Amino acid sequence: TKASVGFKAGVKDYKLTYYTPDYETKDTDILAAFRMSPQPGVPPEEAGAAVAAESSTGTWTTVWTDGLTSLDRYKGRCYHIEPVAGEENQYIAYVAYPLDLFEEGSVTNMFTSIVGNVFGFKALRALRLEDLRIPVAYVKTFQGPPHGIQVERDKLNKYGRPLLGCTIKPKLGLSAKNYGRAVYECLRGGLDFTKDDENVNSQPFMRWRDRFVFCAEAIYKAQAETGEIKGHYLNATAGTCEEMMKRAVFARELGVPIVMHDYLTGGFTANTTLAHYCRDNGLLLHIHRAMHAVIDRQKNHGMHFRVLAKALRMSGGDHIHAGTVVGKLEGERDITLGFVDLLRDDFIEKDRSRGIFFTQDWVSLPGVLPVASGGIHVWHMPALTEIFGDDSVLQFGGGTLGHPWGNAPGAVANRVALEACVQARNEGRDLASEGNAIIREASKWSPELAAACEIWKEIKFEFPAMDTL
């Protein structure tokens, strides 16, 4: 027989195999929405097909081993392409991937397949993954968050309001004893949580074990004084998985309620390992998104944060940082609330105005509390309460520790402001229009809040948003 029978070597157009506009998507498919900017002269169908091919079964040439498998069963398919309104030479390409292409319960494998290779592709000037639809069948292979929102409230015995946190500053340079002292002052003043900064791991000036011990002491002392359950996010992120687990185990032995992980720098494999340990041992897990802007900041290349947020809900975490919205543009507010809902809710309808490309059903996977953190202070409290609602964590670092009288009064000011906003909202007042008045009224009864109002009355962070539709 001749070698050429049934197999023709050579390079052929991707779109012949991988562009299938009449494909009906299956309930079990993983669906992706990519924003493509093709190179000049590359038609969008060919670019979309190339993305589908290179992120699934394809390679740059036909190979004889293609005959040993059923490509129709395993190939990714570009099933729809639409131009992006208001942008020149940008398209949204929708790609469907058969479920069989992915390992169960592995966010790592999902990302390696979908975004591992194709972003360096020459036919594309730029590529951004805007959204993923995770099918129910795949969601069910993940444990998800160790505990979720309801279980966390039950553990903490705190209901009907957002939770309050604070990142301990200066983030690097304090000794363990002084660090613990700062934690104690914040918790005593009325915060629910304090937080290790994301880059506090185990450095020469403060080794992790010493920090854990002094923070545990601070937690127990503050709990005894206030009669409330307190926590400090002990950062277990480390250079190896084994070291990370050692830190998590020690936190459990100390009896503290919560640990922390940097999920992008630490990696999804490490994060999922830690999340499983946390569920098995009753630890809450706070997730910081350090490095996210490297991936999600460019509008035309990388990955939108909503994809990283979905991935975190699958991998596991009880809190995740999600931006603040405050003082930014309206468009960004809708987009942020879109992925905040993806983190918290069980079922989210497709809504392009909020950046949600697909309807997502989480089939009772526990929810994640969004954390608003970064440049916020007491004057932002009404807006934050209105935007994020009860199921959130509001974190004021400088907005607590920058109080002229110290940490504990700074914590008091934030707690009073929060309780005032929640009470006003429950009485039916409009936080958006009456916010400043509500804070001013409350400050008459709280000298700590009055001092905070005075010091931060003029501070704003006004820059145009990067992230528009």
UniProtKB/Swiss-Prot annotation:
One of its GO terms (biological process) is photorespiration. InterPro entries: RuBisCO, RuBisCo_large_chain_AS, RuBisCO_lsu_C, RuBisCO_lsu_C_sf, RuBisCO_lsu_fd_N, RuBisCO_lsu_N_sf, RuBisCO_lsuI. The keyword Disulfide bond applies. Mg(2+) binds at K195, D197, E198. Its EC number is 4.1.1.39. It comes from the Eukaryota. Substrate binds at N117, T167, K171, R289, H321, S373. The modification N6,N6,N6-trimethyllysine is found at K8. The active site is at K169 (proton acceptor), H288 (proton acceptor). Pfam families: RuBisCO_large, RuBisCO_large_N. One of its GO terms (cellular component) is chloroplast. Its cofactor is Mg(2+). It is an enzyme of class 4 (lyase). RuBisCO catalyzes two reactions: the carboxylation of D-ribulose 1,5-bisphosphate, the primary event in carbon dioxide fixation, as well as the oxidative fragmentation of the pentose substrate in the photorespiration process. Both reactions occur simultaneously and in competition at the same active site. The basic functional RuBisCO is composed of a large chain homodimer in a 'head-to-tail' conformation. In form I RuBisCO this homodimer is arranged in a barrel-like tetramer with the small subunits forming a tetrameric 'cap' on each end of the 'barrel'. Heterohexadecamer of 8 large chains and 8 small chains; disulfide-linked. The disulfide link is formed within the large subunit homodimers. This is Ribulose bisphosphate carboxylase large chain. It comes from Akania bidwillii (Turnipwood).
